[in-house]
Amino acid sequence: MRISTAQLHAQGLAGMLGRQQEISRTQQELVTGNKLTRAAQDPAGAASAQRIDHALASLEQFERNSGLVGHRLRLQEGALGDAGDTLTRARELAIQGNNAALSDGDRTMLVAELRALQSQMLGIANRDDGNGRQLFAGTRDGVTPFALSAGNVSYAGDDGQNQVDIGPGLAVGDTNAGSEVFLRVRAGTGDVRGSADPGNSGRAVLQATSVADSAQWNGATLRLQFTGPDAYEIHDANGAVVSTGSYLSGDSIDVGGVTLRLTGAPAAGDGFDVQRAPNQAVFTTLQRLADAMAAPAATDAQRARRDNIISESLADLSSAQDHLLRMRADTGARLAAVDAAADTREAGEISMTETLSSLRDVDFAEAASRLTLHLTALEAAQATMMRVQGLSLFDRLR
């Protein structure tokens, strides 16, 4: 088979161009540190690297999300702790105020501190995260959730809670809505609430309420109605008499499965109500306690009314403290989930980075050796081309 001079030139040129392309690719790998400079070099590897890039970008977003929600949850945990301390102080003041020997001046000082505690609680409920977002506004940004007007606290947030993605298929709840934290708080014991009729004219004070038989009570609304200083009737929700009994100061009275302990002498017609514990805002609890202590107490009936509200408030405050402790424990559980997700993300990131490195990163020693090989091959091809160019039949005939 004869090979023409033109073919020899074409083959030689193609060989040199191929070597030059290999040299260029190898030099680019050494400069960039990336051996997947073109997808055509390794289509499967390039596709895998692209998937890992996307996964790593998602992990970075999850990390940013975790940082934000973790910061907000830590602030919520601190706010709940401060709110609990505020209620603890209010309870101490209530116990001090539940003292018949207290002077009017001392009681006035207690009332002033209770008012300050209410303002303090409002400030806690309106805290933000330092980035312009309220902690307790639910999903509503840009609003101050709580406002005090004419002695009443209103809520401008909503009941929602944002769910924040912190890992693949894993989301955690953001801070709780203020309505859940500060408004929907069970009064009384959390299960049942006993309260004195504000129209009572006797001196009886309800000291404690507790559920003795939950099956018997079953959440029923009942009323203890005194027919005299030492006799009473139990009425159901329809006003029907279901039982009667006699009373001595300090007695515990069973009211349909709920035990009421009273002291003092009631008047005929005085009543005490038993009901399933309703929700009561912590602001209302503080306001009610302060108002009761500030109210005139010149008569036995007025003093009994004040003491009944203080007694009820002590139960309400204890229930509110338990509520905040539960909220704080739930917040801690979410923070633990954020921390656990961070550990999982870190492990995943290390694994994916190692895989990506094996797919993409250049082995510099191997690439340098390969470059030397390609350069040597190019020099040999160039030398061969030069020799071929010098060959011709006329040279042989000289």
Residue ranges and their predicted role:
Residues M1-A150, V172, A277, T284-R398:
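Amphipathic alpha-helical polymerization modules
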